[in-house]
Every structure is written in structure tokens, then in C-alpha cells.
């Protein structure tokens, strides 16, 4: 009997049918063919007749790695994710169907950003919920039968005489086909549901005339799903070592404590806390990167200490009432860009114990005046001559946007001043939108070309611990021109009008931060200033 793999049925059908009725008819016809050709070769609609050395792609249960051999996949899971399929199967005495459920259970948990609980397998595998394939055409499921048959042959030490070996082969094949049939029926039901949802959505869209609200959150979380952004952040030694040193130098406040990591990303801060002795770390993220964070925890033997939860901090619940410490790297350009501080403050109000600690404990926005003739003017002067053409109209956008770049310390022409402080234990979401006064004294004569701002970050081990005015490595880190450059760089507000100022001239004014009305993750900045009795102002958008 020539048996064509079930995964191929599904592939062929999806090329030929376009409606749910077509799917149902295709299933009926295909299994009718199978039943009427029990001992002969089947005509597969002129598809390939011979299925020799077919190459399968086996996807890892925990990460994006793929393999062409199932045994290689299990070896990878054991080495990279501390999951021994053969040991789990043997210890729990799992049969063919239970192994199917095990694979689907693990895939479903990883997809939801959760850590699979293998200690409760007996209860979990009683449900038929995990007979439904998580991945379409999951080669692991379709090859488990061969895997288990192979195990049986390896373990069988008795020679048994079989009158008709073909009958045993057919029985095994029938068993496998029944399972594959059940899987396909489950997949068909999912397709049916998806199709109905699609039709319902289309109908709703046709009836509705109300413009859809921009989904800025989805775009935001998707932007943190890839490796590049995390490479940039982790490679920032000032940032990463600042957090690491705070945790490792203060292991006494983490030992035996419960920690919440808001926006865990790759899980680096959670792993720092676990290594420092935290009893439990709850790592929350709403981006696909959480799947890699789970893999990272498994790989480093920290999966028992860290529980990953996928979702918005505003929506999720924790297995515990309160936590002892909340840690988060939430800072954006100009500190509040992307508005992640809002989520951290929500987490504090929902989950932090009254005596709990926020890490970092305080952040400060800092402003200075900048003088230069080259670096800061480059994005403006570029448009004066573009391959022989004038494009001066393009200059306007450069004055409306915030230029994020590394500013040399030599361009700083006034003693920096703090214009906003955020005590993370007490501040409120509404405090993030503000207007603050500032006063700068010019150090050397020259044109006032721009205002430049950055932020400083402070860590404390107690809620009431005094915070020094000066920033140093012992208490935190700076993102200013005087320090080692970071991926945050500095934010430059270029001025249209550039008055020439003498040494000692005072520049006074106000600076305002507010959320952009079109996208609340973008940042609007307005500056009003007065020099020698002459007032001026300018507004910017950081997006």
C-alpha cells in the first residue's frame, strides 16, 4: 500500500480549494479514495507517485530553530532548553496520543509567552484540547508515530513470530491515519472558524463608516520583536552594566524576594535578579521577543525561578498579590518617548508592596545650551546644495523634529540644569506631561544654536534613601555628553534664530513635555525662552 503523508494532503487541498465546502468535499473524497484502495496504489491526482527520502522540517518547541531530523530536534531541546523528550515520555509513561498532546501543550504555552509546567502533565494531558495542532502541518506530530515505533523496536528484546507481518504494518498505518484524520478535522474546524470571523469582519467593515483608531500599541510592541533593537540595547555597556552592577552589588535586597520585570525583552534583567538570589521573578512583555526570553531562561537553567507572562501590564494578573521589587528599563529618547513610564507606574500601583523598591528609583531630565558651527548644522545645510539643486523647503522639517545624536562635550556652552525629576516611588502618570522653568548662564561667547537635553538614572536600596545631586557610577548612570555615549545619545532642539551671546548672558524660559495627540507614544516638546529682553519659542515632535 502506497501511503502518502497526511501533511501533503493538506498542502494539495490548499492549492485547489477556496471555500469551506470545498474543504469538506475534499476530505470526504480523499478518505473515500483511501478506503477503496486498501491494497493497491492510489491515484493521487497526478501528484508525485513516489515519496522516497522526503525531507521534513522540524520546528523547535521553544525557539525558531529548525531541523531535518527529529532526533536532532530532541537533542537541541535537551541541550538548549533543558527539555528531554525521551525522559519525559518514559517518566510519565506517555503513549502516542499523549505525546501529541505534550508537543501541542508546550507549543501553546510558548506561543502565549508562558513557561510549560511539566510537573502537572498528568492533569494537563487528560484534556483533548491539546489534540489540536498549534502549528499548521507540524512535521513533529506527523513523525511521532515513526519515532515511537522505533522506540518500541529498540526496547523489544523478545522475538515474536507473526503469521502475517503485513497485518501488523497495516494496523500501525491505520492507527496513524486515524490520528492524522483527527488532526485534520481539528484543523478544518479552525479554518471554518477563521473563515467565519473573516466574513464577519468584512461585513462589519462594510457597514461601518467610522474611521479606525490607529493601533499605536501594536506597532510599538512589534518594534521590539526582532533581534536588532535588543542587540543595540544589550550592547550599550552603560545601560546594561548599570543595571547589572546595581543588582549584583546589592544581592542582599534581592535574596529570597519576589521581583517583577516590566518589559522584560530578552530576559536579561530577570536573569540578573535570579542570579542575585531572587526567589521568584515574574517577567512580563507583550512582544514576540518573550519567546526568546523563555528560551534564554531555559538555556541558563533559570526557568524554575523565572515565570514569563505575555500581555500588557495593565491587563495581566500575577499569581501573587504583591512583589518586593519592580525592575524595568523603560527609558526612551528624552526619557519619556514611547510612554513606557506609564506602564511602569501602573505596575507599581497594582503590584508593588508598600515597602517595595523601584529600580531605577529616580530619573532626571537635564538641559543645556549648545554652540557649534558644524555637527549640529549639518542636517540643515545639507539641503542648500543637493547635487547642484536647492532644496531649502526641506529645512523646515529639521527645525520641527528632534535630532538624536551624540553631542561632543566641547559644544556644551552652559552649566547643565535639571528641569524635571521623577521619583518612581511617588510620581503619577499625569506628572509626565509638564511645563518647567529653566535658567542657563552662557559660559563662552558664541551663537546659541540649540538646546540639548538628556536624562540621568539613579538606583537606591531604600525608598527614603537620599539621592545625590551629582551622578556617578556608584548610584546610577548618565546619558549626557560628559559620560560614555549610550544608545540614547542626546536630544538636540535646533533653533531657527541663533542670537550671538556674550559670556555670562542668562537664558531663561520654560520647557514643556506632552504626549502627541495623533500618537500618544510620540513626544511633543515646546521651548519658550528670553534673552536680553527678546522672547522666542519653538515646538518639536520626537517620533
From Swiss-Prot:
Q: Which GO terms describe its cellular component?
A: cytoplasm; cytosol; nucleus
Domain SAM-dependent MTase PRMT-type intervals: 217-543
Q: Where is the active site?
A: 329, 338
Q: What class of enzyme is it?
A: transferase
The UniProt keywords, alphabetically, are:
Cytoplasm, Metal-binding, Methyltransferase, S-adenosyl-L-methionine, Transferase, Zinc, Zinc-finger
Q: What does the record give under GO molecular function?
A: histone methyltransferase activity; protein-arginine N-methyltransferase activity; protein-arginine omega-N asymmetric methyltransferase activity; protein-arginine omega-N monomethyltransferase activity; ribosome binding; zinc ion binding
Positions bound to S-adenosyl-L-homocysteine: 239, 263, 285, 287, 313-314
Give the record's subunit note.
Answer: Interacts with ef1a-c, rps2 and rps24. Note=Associates with the 40S ribosomal particle.
PANTHER family the UniProt entry points to: PROTEIN ARGININE N-METHYLTRANSFERASE, RIBOSOMAL PROTEIN ARGININE N-METHYLTRANSFERASE RMT3
Family to which this protein belongs = Belongs to the class I-like SAM-binding methyltransferase superfamily. Protein arginine N-methyltransferase family.
Name assigned to this protein: Ribosomal protein arginine N-methyltransferase rmt3
Encoded by which gene?
Answer: rmt3
Amino acid at each position: 500500500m502506497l501511503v502518502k503523508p497526511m501533511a501533503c494532503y493538506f498542502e494539495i487541498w490548499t492549492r485547489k480549494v477556496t471555500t469551506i465546502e470545498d474543504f469538506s468535499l475534499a476530505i470526504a473524497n480523499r478518505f473515500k479514495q483511501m478506503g477503496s484502495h486498501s491494497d493497491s496504489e492510489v491515484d493521487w491526482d497526478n501528484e508525485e507517485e513516489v515519496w522516497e527520502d522526503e525531507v521534513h522540517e522540524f520546528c523547535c518547541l521553544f525557539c525558531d530553530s529548525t531541523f531535518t531530523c527529529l532526533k536532532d530536534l530532541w537533542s537541541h531541546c535537551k541541550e538548549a532548553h533543558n527539555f528531554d523528550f525521551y525522559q519525559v515520555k518514559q517518566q510519565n509513561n506517555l503513549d502516542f496520543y499523549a505525546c501529541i498532546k505534550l508537543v501541542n501543550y508546550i507549543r501553546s504555552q510558548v506561543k502565549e509567552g508562558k513557561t510549560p509546567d511539566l510537573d502537572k502533565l498528568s492533569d494537563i494531558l487528560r484534556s483533548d484540547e491539546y489534540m489540536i495542532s498549534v502549528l499548521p502541518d507540524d512535521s513533529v506530530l506527523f513523525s511521532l508515530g515513526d519515532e515511537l515505533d522505533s522506540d518500541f523496536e529498540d526496547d523489544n528484546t523478545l522475538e515474536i513470530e507473526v503469521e502475517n507481518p503485513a497485518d501488523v504494518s497495516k494496523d500501525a498505518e491505520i492507527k496513524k491515519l486515524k490520528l492524522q484524520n483527527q488532526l485534520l478535522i481539528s484543523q478544518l474546524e479552525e479554518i471554518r472558524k477563521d473563515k467565519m470571523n473573516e466574513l464577519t469582519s468584512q461585513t462589519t467593515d462594510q457597514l461601518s463608516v467610522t474611521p479606525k483608531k490607529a493601533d499605536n500599541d501594536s506597532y510599538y510592541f512589534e518594534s521590539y520583536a526582532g533581534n536588532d533593537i535588543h542587540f543595540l540595547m544589550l550592547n550599550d555597556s552603560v545601560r546594561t552594566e548599570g543595571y547589572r552592577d546595581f543588582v549584583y552589588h546589592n544581592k542582599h535586597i534581592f535574596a529570597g524576594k519576589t521581583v517583577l520585570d516590566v518589559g522584560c525583552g530578552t530576559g536579561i534583567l530577570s536573569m540578573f535578579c535570579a542570579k542575585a538570589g531572587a526567589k521568584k521573578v515574574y517577567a512580563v512583555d507583550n512582544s514576540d521577543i518573550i519567546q526568546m526570553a523563555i528560551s534564554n531562561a531555559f538555556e541558563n537553567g533559570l526557568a524554575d525561578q523565572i515565570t514569563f507572562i505575555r500581555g500588557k501590564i495593565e491587563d495581566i494578573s500575577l499569581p501573587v498579590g504583591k512583589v518586593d521589587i519592580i525592575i524595568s528599563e523603560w527609558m526612551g529618547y528624552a526619557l519619556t518617548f514611547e510612554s513606557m513610564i506609564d506602564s511602569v507606574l501602573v505596575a507599581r500601583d497594582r503590584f508593588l508592596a508598600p515597602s517595595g523598591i523601584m529600580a531605577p528609583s529616580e530619573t532626571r531630565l537635564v538641559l543645556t545650551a549648545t554652540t557649534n558651527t558644524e555637527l549640529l548644522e549639518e542636517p540643515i545645510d545639507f539641503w542648500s546644495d543637493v547635487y547642484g539643486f536647492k532644496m531649502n523647503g526641506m529645512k523646515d522639517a529639521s527645525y520641527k523634529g528632534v535630532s538624536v545624536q551624540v553631542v561632543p562635550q566641547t559644544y556644551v556652552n552652559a552649566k547643565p540644569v535639571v528641569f524635571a525629576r521623577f521619583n518612581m516611588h511617588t510620581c503619577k502618570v499625569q506628572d509626565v506631561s509638564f511645563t518647567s522653568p529653566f535658567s542657563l548662564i552662557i559660559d563662552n561667547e558664541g551663537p546659541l544654536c540649540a538646546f540639548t537635553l538628556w536624562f540621568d538614572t539613579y538606583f537606591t536600596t531604600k525608598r527614603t534613601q537620599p539621592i545625590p545631586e551629582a551622578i556617578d557610577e556608584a548610584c546610577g548612570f548618565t546619558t549626557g555628553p560628559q559620560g560614555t555615549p549610550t544608545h540614547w545619545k542626546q536630544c538636540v532642539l535646533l533653533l531657527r534664530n541663533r542670537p550671538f551671546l556674550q559670556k555670562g548672558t542668562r537664558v531663561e524660559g520654560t520647557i514643556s513635555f506632552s504626549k502627541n495627540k495623533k500618537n500618544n507614544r510620540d513626544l511633543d516638546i515646546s521651548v519658550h525662552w528670553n534673552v536680553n529682553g527678546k522672547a522666542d519659542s519653538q515646538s518639536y515632535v520626537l517620533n
